[in-house]
Amino acid sequence: MQIVRLLALLALLSLLAAAAASASAPIPAEKAGKAVLPELQPSWFLALDYDGAAYVFDGADGEVKGTISHSQYTTAIVTLPSRKEAYLVDSYYSRLVRGTRTDVLTVVDMSNLTTKAEIQLPAKTATLLIRGHIGLLNDERHVVVFNMTPAQSVSIVDVVDRKFVGEISTAGCAIVMPVELRSFLMLCGDGTLQLIELSADGSEVGRRRSKVFFDVNKDPVFSEVKYTGSGWLLTTHNGSVREVRVVSGRIDIGEAWSMLTDEDRQDGNTKEQWRPGGMQPFALHRSAALFYALMHKGKVDTHGQDGKEIWVFDTNRRRRVARFALPFEGRSLLVSQEAVPRIYLSDKDHKLHIYDGYKLKLQRSIDDSGLSGGALLQALMPYD
């Protein structure tokens, strides 16, 4: 009996010794993997909010392809598929919300959504979710970043040589609209457009102003401008639309047309009319020349109100071709540039909804989008 007990005790001691040896052995560190994305697809889009992540969605199936990390003060992202890079401005404070501020232009590798480089900028970039606060010029070398302190200026960045080129004063003007080679337009508070031209090294070589074509006190232009392929569509708070272009260094301001018919105006009254509105109220499908707008009935200065309907316009014929009521209020609007466009919509509950852009039928909703606030929706293209 004593021999049996002794054998049992020895067996127990052996197990304890083995366990102790196993516990003391170092566990190999697990290495994080790095997935490689397939080629960017025209159905992919970005949803960016203030919470530090831009989600890359595929509108074809509603799946998340990955996330791009950014600061809480990032304004928008510019994607350059030909170089497989994206550019965004990050602003950081040494004490999170106070202290020394550092602004950088972050270069993202779009093959795996990791950071490739940082280029330090003057610590004065505007920090609103507005697509037009950053622009890539068509030399695919210079990125223009809008600053406001409240003095207005732009920072010019060479993303090929990875360096800050310089700062250009743009007093009274905002929104970067790339046009001819190394040139960009800006909207100005005096009702004009400003054209700034750069040299090959990114320094300013010329600027000019257009004639006055709108009154900021009577009918302001939205900051949400849409690239047409040859120029930019500008829309006012009352629904006046026109295209502006630059031809051989000359600013061409197209004739305005109205989103509202006489019947639309009669549907309203002296206080409330149909108006465009929302955080991101417009989208344009370039090849089909279809202009989509979030619309609501409201008083003057309700341009931030979410839309209850989507109106669709043929910009060639300058007339509405469709309208449909939404089962929710739309906040941000984007249209893919696929042959058959998809409409991407966000709402106040941070959900995303995807519609067929021709049939205007719901394809899917993404209830758990990961977004925590109003989202800026962007295509993975240089000017969208």
Question: What function would you assign to each model-found segment?
Answer:
Residues 25-28, 63-69, 75, 114-125, ...:
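A short beta-strand motif characteristic of beta-propeller blades
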Residues 59-61, 110-112, 158-162, 198-201, ...:
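Short loop/turn segments that connect beta-strands within beta-propeller blades
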